[in-house]
Structure formats: C-alpha cells, structure tokens
Curated annotation (Swiss-Prot):
Membrane topology qualifier: Multi-pass membrane protein
The EC number(s) this enzyme carries: 7.1.1.-
Catalytic activity field: a quinone + NADH + 5 H(+)(in) = a quinol + NAD(+) + 4 H(+)(out)
Quaternary structure and partners: NDH-1 is composed of 14 different subunits. Subunits NuoA, H, J, K, L, M, N constitute the membrane sector of the complex.
MF terms in GO: NADH:ubiquinone reductase (non-electrogenic) activity; quinone binding
Cleavable signal peptide: none
Name under which the protein is recorded: NADH-quinone oxidoreductase subunit K
Source organism per UniProt: Helicobacter pylori (strain G27)
Amino acid sequence: MIGLNHYLIVSGLLFCIGLAGMLKRKNILLLFFSTEIMLNAINIGFIAISKYTHNLDGQMFALFIIAIAASEVAIGLGLVILWFKKYKSLDIDSLNAMKG
C-alpha cells in the first residue's frame, strides 16, 4: 500500500524539479511551466495530507490553488504572447529593454 510518505516524497521531488527549472531557465514560457509543476506538487501534498487526516481542508486548498493557477496561466500566456510579438524573444535577458 502506498503511504503518506510516498506521496510527500513525490510531492517534494516535483517541487524540487520545478524550483530547479525556475532557477536554471531563462525562457519565460519555461518559467511558467516550472511554476505549474511547483503548484501541482503543492496540490499533491495538500491532498495526500487531507486524505490521511480525513479532513477536507487540504482538498479545498488544492481547489483554490487550481483556480489561481488557471488564472495565472490565462493572464501569463497572454502577456507572453504580447511580449513575443513585441520583442521576438522569450528570454528574460530582454526584460532589460523595459527599463526606462
């Protein structure tokens, strides 16, 4: 049987993968993907703890995070599309062009 520790280990590994992606990548789109991986890792942790404590609070937090992530993707991808149309690049280094 898969225990709580297994879920939390998977959640921690996914979070570390997302964090490494956030720190290593210079592409805005890949930063969004890394953020989504981190949020899903948090959801796995919340749901696993919620299941094993028989409390629905963790599942409610997970649903709230899913709603926030969906709005983040909608707004973020819109901004990424506008960014690409204007600068023809998705690198973070081109953010210096925004300085006054």
